Amino acid sequence: MNLIPSAPPMADYLRLRADSGLSPRTAAQAEGALANSWRWCHAMVDGEVVAMGRILGDGGWYFHIADMATLPAFQGRGIGRAILEWLLAEIRTHAPEDPYITLMADEPGRPLYRRLGFVETAPRSLGMWLPG
């Protein structure tokens, strides 16, 4: 496995989202995501993009982990963990002191996030979204 500190190609981004169970996105949505994230990391195995993750953030204090996705055939091999550890190291290296790091955790990813120190915010706060 090789970690690549950049965004995956658009076709791979769209495929990873769909094949890993994340909601599908359009090419126009992918274009914005690929161009405007604070940091990206993707993993390749035998020339295939098999996992990815990115950070949204202001570079000051707020950072949000997004698009953590691993193809089902490659889950359970530590690839997602390696990507998340790389992303967190980028924040710790380049952000000012005491960054605020968030993510939205679907059920399959929660054990990984807990192992790396993330805690649920409920009942103090709950994630919300605006359907649209």
Task: Write out the residue ranges for each language-model feature.
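Conserved GNAT acetyl-CoA-binding A-motif
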Residues: 91-105
